[in-house]
């Protein structure tokens, strides 16, 4: 009987722990949050119980504190943060790159420390599309401008066109010149906050061959004229740069 009640209590404790995990009251890992430079971001705390004491920290440094109903913000966060005294959620305004870090919230009313990792991103620029001919194929590359250095590792690539190649999530794709080429292809860059798209017309990647064909076709014409002139001159029919003999036979 005792064993049965112990098992029941253990099951009950396990159920409570699972519920706490589900509702976010126990946090073993940092929740990833994304914000944009000069924007704002909120660390949401799932609590409906009014909190009398709250401490927010960035690593080991204090960010904001609520104690005895008195709110204080610290260092560079002064006049840039708002604390919801009911839930404990913290909002940071006018984000800068230096705000990026791990934040944690502590309160006697919450079982464990809440942790968040903030990524501060810059607006995503439009991609640059270039193309080149390589061994009978057209290579199209989608590139990020060199000056953009904000979390390149978070950027994903996607293509849009009716061909199989566009299903790849890579920085470059290839098209055979003998295939029916799509009129336009698009490349999209995306990260957790932004996406931008650029397009290119594939036919502009192929150099025009019409002028080269006419140029090469005209080459034999002057050669034929020169050859004919030489043959006629050698046979005495055409005399170049010679005046006729006007001496009187008398």
Curated annotation (Swiss-Prot):
It comes from the Eukaryota. Interacts with CD2. Interacts with CMTM6. (Microbial infection) Interacts with human cytomegalovirus protein UL148; this interaction retains immature CD58 intracellularly. InterPro entries: CD2/SLAM_rcpt (IPR015631), Ig-like_dom_sf (IPR036179), Ig-like_fold (IPR013783). The chain crosses the membrane at residues 216-238. SUPFAM superfamilies: Immunoglobulin. It comes from Homo sapiens. Disulfide bonds join 142-187. GO terms for biological process: cell-cell adhesion; cellular response to tumor necrosis factor; cellular response to type II interferon; heterotypic cell-cell adhesion; immune response; positive regulation of interleukin-8 production. Residues 1-28 form the signal peptide. Glycans are attached at residues 40, 94, 109, 135, 169, 195. Keywords: Cell membrane, Disulfide bond, Glycoprotein, Immunoglobulin domain, Membrane, Signal, Transmembrane, Transmembrane helix. This is Lymphocyte function-associated antigen 3. Ligand of the T-lymphocyte CD2 glycoprotein. This interaction is important in mediating thymocyte interactions with thymic epithelial cells, antigen-independent and -dependent interactions of T-lymphocytes with target cells and antigen-presenting cells and the T-lymphocyte rosetting with erythrocytes. In addition, the LFA-3/CD2 interaction may prime response by both the CD2+ and LFA-3+ cells. Residues 30-121 form the Ig-like domain. One of its GO terms (cellular component) is cell surface. The keyword Transmembrane helix applies.
